[in-house]
Amino acid sequence: MVDLQPDEVAAVLKQQLAHLKTDTELEEVGTVLQVGDGVAHIYGLTKIQAGELVEFENGKKAIALNLEENSVGAVIFGDAEGIGEGSTAKRTKRIASIHVGEGMIGRVVNTLGEPIDGKGPIKGELYEMPLERKAPGVLYRQPVAEPLQTGIKAIDAMIPIGRGQRELIIGDRQTGKTTLAIDTILNQRTYFEQGNPVYCIYVAIGQKASTIASVMASLEKYGAMEYTTIVAAPAATAASLQYFAPFTGATIGEYFRDTGKPALVIYDDLSKQAVAYREVSLLLRRPPGREAYPGDVFYLHSRLLERAAKINANDDIAQQMNDLPPSLEGKVKGGGSLTALPIIETQNGDVSAYIPTNVISITDGQIFLESALFNAGIRPAINVGISVSRVGGAAQVKAMKKVAGTLKLDQAQFRELEAFSKFGSDLDVATQRTIDRGRKNQEILKQGLHHPLTLEEQVCILYASTNGYLDKISLSQVTEFEKSYLSLLKSQHKGVLAKIAAGEWSDGIAQVLAEEAKNLAQLYVNDTSINS
């Protein structure tokens, strides 16, 4: 028999005990009382927080929205398969969050930030950020001062948008709302090529999967997916995922905003999000209000849209921002921005309905698209009279301000006079001239699908239009004149175009544009007189 030395035994025991973990961890576990329609009522989670994630025994997750006296109402992310009465659910002690990073650029993700485009997992460094977060306080913001060029003449000239602004796109179905948003994303290609990208996030809420696929195909065709992320919550997904999809988009945008970069988020559309929220609220037995929406539907949209902001350029101030996620510590930079373009669908042009009026009052202006204009072939079908940008004027570049200063007023006046002229009364020469110029301006402001124009192209053509160089040419020749004029300037005056692109404006630039417009217009007038 081998002699055992006491010190050897002690050494072996010490070695074994060194790896022994005696810490006990308490898990708060509840029992599902009832489940149905994507909502689970759980008993036993007495210390749970509002908005906390709950995990079921099969790994599926839900978010606690209703904290009642004897139970918790939790909305399940996705379907409720495998969850039944008596199933266990445990607290995660984590607020709903997603993992965000630059690897998301060019990807299609779902509401939970998981890739759904079949290209494998998201690569690169990822940061955990909460879906719900307080908007930056007043101290950490600065006024909107930098333009966000949409590439759409009617918007950049009359309803300018600045970086950090919230501008509503509102109109009936099939009036070109999504097209307007997609064209804005396509126009950011210029900045991407210059090395100063505006990162775009397109959030599709409650749309057909085929529509989302079509949007993605358009973005890929024009090379816009290189700086764009799509968050997809199609019509077939659960109401809970449609409700949270805009918050996912805002969180991705906030990552770029807080790291000092410009971002643009498009919510297409918030009407469907409100419907999804109404469904969730009614299933949770919350008392319905106007149009059966819950009482806090205004707060739903205000807390989402307030997250769009232009952040103070001072790094030290930006780093003290309220509610910064711990994962971004040491990475926060000032000067970033998040611009929001929410979309709202109206019924028969009724902008005074509940959800439209709510969102109009939250945003910094609205672009109203009209069915009558769209059907008349005026596209984009923007009603200039009731469209407005409350803060974007401060961000408009000098050259655009100079050429389009009175355009909005002139077009509103033209619409009024045109309506009056339909009564058939004799019009004086001045009124006829105003109507004629208004029609030509209207023709100039028309734009083709997925055909955004650069700043310098817009300034040049609007200068010719607003200064009367199109007065003598016929309405049918306006589009042809525009193409010829821009082609001429690109071939013979590249230096002038470069100055306008940099935001410069001078009498010398105006003189070059005036001479070329006058000479070209004369050719069209002579051509018309010869043919007649």
From Swiss-Prot:
Predominant cellular place of this UniProt entry's protein: membrane
Instruction: Please name the HAMAP family in this protein's record.
Output: ATP_synth_alpha_bact
Catalytic activities: ATP + H2O + 4 H(+)(in) = ADP + phosphate + 5 H(+)(out)
What is annotated about its quaternary structure and interactions?
F-type ATPases have 2 components, CF(1) - the catalytic core - and CF(0) - the membrane proton channel. CF(1) has five subunits: alpha(3), beta(3), gamma(1), delta(1), epsilon(1). CF(0) has three main subunits: a(1), b(2) and c(9-12). The alpha and beta chains form an alternating ring which encloses part of the gamma chain. CF(1) is attached to CF(0) by a central stalk formed by the gamma and epsilon chains, while a peripheral stalk is formed by the delta and b chains.
User: Which PANTHER family does the protein's record reference?
Assistant: ATP SYNTHASE SUBUNIT ALPHA, MITOCHONDRIAL (PTHR48082:SF2)
Annotated GO molecular function terms are:
ADP binding; ATP binding; proton-transporting ATP synthase activity, rotational mechanism
As recorded in UniProt, its EC number(s) are 7.1.2.2
Its function, per the record, reads: Produces ATP from ADP in the presence of a proton gradient across the membrane. The alpha chain is a regulatory subunit.
Annotated membrane topology: Peripheral membrane protein
Q: What gene is this protein translated from?
A: atpA
List localization entries. Answer: Cell membrane
Name of one Pfam family that matches? ATP-synt_ab
Q: What organism does this protein naturally occur in?
A: Amoebophilus asiaticus (strain 5a2)
Q: Which residues bind ATP?
A: G171, D172, R173, Q174, T175, G176, K177, T178
This protein is called ATP synthase subunit alpha
Q: Which UniProt keywords apply?
A: ATP synthesis, ATP-binding, Cell membrane, CF(1), Hydrogen ion transport, Ion transport, Membrane, Nucleotide-binding, Translocase, Transport
Residues in a coiled coil are: none
What lineage is this protein's organism placed in? Answer: Bacteria, Pseudomonadati, Bacteroidota, Cytophagia, Cytophagales
> What InterPro entries does the annotation carry?
ATP_synth_asu-like_sf, ATP_synth_asu_C, ATP_synth_asu_C_sf, ATP_synth_F1_a_nt-bd_dom, ATP_synth_F1_asu, ATPase_a/bsu_AS, ATPase_F1/V1/A1_a/bsu_N, ATPase_F1/V1/A1_a/bsu_N_sf
Kindly give the Gene3D superfamilies that the UniProt entry links to this protein.
2.40.30.20, ATP synthase alpha/beta chain, C-terminal domain (1.20.150.20), P-loop containing nucleotide triphosphate hydrolases (3.40.50.300)
Q: Which GO terms describe its cellular component?
A: plasma membrane; proton-transporting ATP synthase complex
Give site residues, Required for activity.
Answer: S387
Q: Which family does it belong to?
A: Belongs to the ATPase alpha/beta chains family.
Q: Does the keyword Zinc apply?
A: no
